[in-house]
Amino acid sequence: MSFSTETKNELARVISGNECCNIAELSALVKSGGSIQIVGYKKLNLKITTELNSIARKVFKLLKKNFNINTTISVNKNQMLKRNNSYVLMVTSEMGSEMLLKKLGILEDKEGFFTINKISENLIKHEGCKRAFIRGAFLGGGSISDPEKNYHMEFVTNNEEFADSLKELINSLGFNSKIVARKNNHVVYIKESEQISDLLSIIGGHHALLSLQNTKIVKEMRNNVNRIVNCETANLSKTVNAAVRQVENIKLIQETIGISSLPENLQEIAKIRIEYEDMTLKELGEMLEPPIGKSGVNHRLRKIEEIATDLKKKS
């Protein structure tokens, strides 16, 4: 099961105790996942389609609880395409679809029916209603990426005016959502992990929030470990290359002018370096008598390198 599906299943279980919040959520669900069918003069059917049984059950409960509408859930099987089943709820004109759509702020009756694309201000007067509306919009047309891959939460609609209105609502709560056109749709999206976490929290996706944060922590730890390993690998490679170069310098001196021609302090470090090629500068310094520090060893080896460089130029 995808992270997006898990999140939707969790949010589908959230039922507000306030009627106003339920109506706001149902309005968003219908705007995002519903369609209106004209079946006669001033007669409409409302069709709500979803791929998740949990969302279908939630719509069924909200219709029954807040509007006393008893509808049925039918299942469309997609056997040939091997895709998920889709669940369809139909509210007919006889059931009161026109009354429902008016109360949801979707339909206006002015010498004929007109659909309202903007979010009705009457539906989102209270903070809880705003959160419920966003939750409904996500359940109706939203998705969220697996945090293992990237951070992306979006709300898809085919209506530009509704997309603008939804973006304004989300941003009124302190977020920075944006809109992008995708084929024939308009997508309201958020990409920052912190903002996605906060939005999940206010719409009731607490388990999804914890899962996202845990995944983020693991990713950051993994990245830190990789950085440390890469850094240590680079340092080790640098140390090995330096040791190889130092030994080559000493062998060149040995084959040309002889190590005995070097000052006594350089002879001492040269003999130890060529005998113990794998030792660190610190370990080399501890073998000298008297012992010297890492910087002292490095200074002597640089002197040897200068002599070897001069010999190369002369040859």
From Swiss-Prot:
Full protein name: Probable cell division protein WhiA
Entry function: Involved in cell division and chromosome segregation.
Stored HAMAP family: HTH_type_WhiA
Gene from which this protein is expressed: whiA
Residues of the DNA-binding region: 280-313
Family named by the database record: Belongs to the WhiA family.
Protein origin, superkingdom: Bacteria
GO biological process, one term: regulation of sporulation
GO molecular function, one term: endonuclease activity
NCBIfam families noted in UniProt: DNA_bind_WhiA
PANTHER family, per the entry: CELL DIVISION PROTEIN WHIA-RELATED
Pfam families noted in UniProt: HTH_WhiA, LAGLIDADG_WhiA, WhiA_N
Alphabetically ordered keywords of this record: Cell cycle, Cell division, DNA-binding
Organism, scientific name: Clostridioides difficile (strain 630)
Gene3D superfamilies: Homing endonucleases
